[in-house]
Amino acid sequence: MASGKIAAFRDFSAAAMPNVLRLTDLISEGKLAGKRVFIRADLNVPQDDAGNITEDTRIRASVPAIRAALDAGAAVMVTSHLGRPTEGEFKPEDSLAPVAVRLSELLGCEVKLVQNWVDGVDVAPGQVVLLENCRVNKGEKKNSDELAQKMAKLCDVYVNDAFGTAHRAEATTHGIAKFAPIACAGPLLGAELDALGKALGQPARPLVAIVAGSKVSTKLTILKSLADKVDNLIVGGGIANTFMLAAGLKIGKSLAEADLVGDAKAIIDLMAARGASVPIPVDVVCAKEFSATAAATVKDVKDVADDDMILDIGPKTAAQLADQLKASGTIVWNGPVGVFEFDQFGNGTKVLAEAIAASSGFSIAGGGDTLAAIAKYGIADRVGYISTGGGAFLEFLEGKTLPAVEILEQRAQRQEALA
């Protein structure tokens, strides 16, 4: 990694997260031995109808914080939400029981599941317990101070290691951090913020963003935020169709939002005014219908017919964009550029994914469809950082304050003032 990139990363970290206390700081200072540590993790994993965990990435990602606290001699409590339970009404399908089993396998020790834990938890140093689904507790979603104060009394140290919920102000992500004796960021949360800071703070140039998806409306704030920052803004999917309309091109019966053409044109003009660009496709892959068996036809953009649906970028466009990505210093990737679930409309996403993997620049990727594309094309080990954040990742790109991070910043400043 070039020294310039490291410097950019450090500069942004200092600016974006002033003095946020980290779990690693406490461990290096020997401050966890014998302490009660409450870790808010993100263990919200998918399950099949029988309750079997189908994908355990989030559980595996939570292990380093838990292991570090155990090794430091702490009594460890871990909680998470799972699904969308009704507060005050616990149902079997809301239980973290399968997660407790998987955690015990990964940690190599017993992980007891504790019900009705708000008023007290029995755990000894060197032990870890999993506290049942925190969203079952009344007041969790509304960030109740009463609930948060009860939870804060359970611990000496609160650790937020759940970047995926950092955009939500809830009792276990925000309220408890106000009242716990010490509040800090865990290694997963810290790594997410470092990676995002590296990509957007003082990034190595050129900075290229890929923002794709079906609708401009859902990502308009992100597009406008990035238009101020990036050198190239690559758009894909239905979003690209709206930008093609803004550029005066025909898109047939493709998915687009005619009412947002003005916004798209404003973004194109804003980028052009500062010497940046929104590359408009020169060729596209069309079909007459949206289906897994639809025949794919490559066309120049000027040849799109009235009954065509654009379902991918064409090979010339993909090659041009791949060259830009390979030459970039920093890449932010959110969304596939075509309907990659159907192989005949997946070439654009595949070519860009391989270009990102081949780039010597720093890359960060996030969003469910993006992660699925990374898995499909086997490039996970060649992406600089893969965000587990989902909604939090998108809100960071929008330039929004993440409540769970903001409270850690405030606590760090208070803790420093008292030191």
Swiss-Prot record:
Which residues does substrate bind?
42-44, 58, 81-84, 135, 168
Q: Which residues are listed for ATP binding in this entry?
A: 219, 341, 367-370
PROSITE patterns assigned to the protein according to its UniProt record, in alphabetical order: PGLYCERATE_KINASE
Q: Give an example GO biological process.
A: glycolytic process
State whether keyword Lipoprotein applies: no
Catalysed reaction(s)? Answer: (2R)-3-phosphoglycerate + ATP = (2R)-3-phospho-glyceroyl phosphate + ADP
The pathway to which it is assigned is: Carbohydrate degradation; glycolysis; pyruvate from D-glyceraldehyde 3-phosphate: step 2/5
* E.C. numbers: 2.7.2.3
Give the main localization category.
Answer: cytoplasm
This protein's GO cellular component annotations are: cytosol
Query: What keywords tag this UniProt record?
Result: ATP-binding, Cytoplasm, Glycolysis, Kinase, Nucleotide-binding, Transferase
Q: Which residues form the signal peptide?
A: none
Q: Which InterPro entries match?
A: Phosphoglycerate_kinase (IPR001576), Phosphoglycerate_kinase_CS (IPR015911), Phosphoglycerate_kinase_N (IPR015824), Phosphoglycerate_kinase_sf (IPR036043)
> Cross-referenced Pfam families, in alphabetical order?
PGK (PF00162)
| Molecular functions per Gene Ontology | ADP binding; ATP binding; phosphoglycerate kinase activity
Broad class of enzyme this protein falls into: transferase
Subcellular location as annotated: Cytoplasm
Transmembrane residue ranges? none
Family label: Belongs to the phosphoglycerate kinase family.
| HAMAP family attached to this UniProt entry | Phosphoglyc_kinase
Assembly with partners or alone: Monomer.
Q: Which PANTHER family match?
A: PHOSPHOGLYCERATE KINASE, PHOSPHOGLYCERATE KINASE 1, CHLOROPLASTIC-RELATED
Q: What is this protein called?
A: Phosphoglycerate kinase
Originating organism: Ralstonia nicotianae (strain ATCC BAA-1114 / GMI1000) (Ralstonia solanacearum)
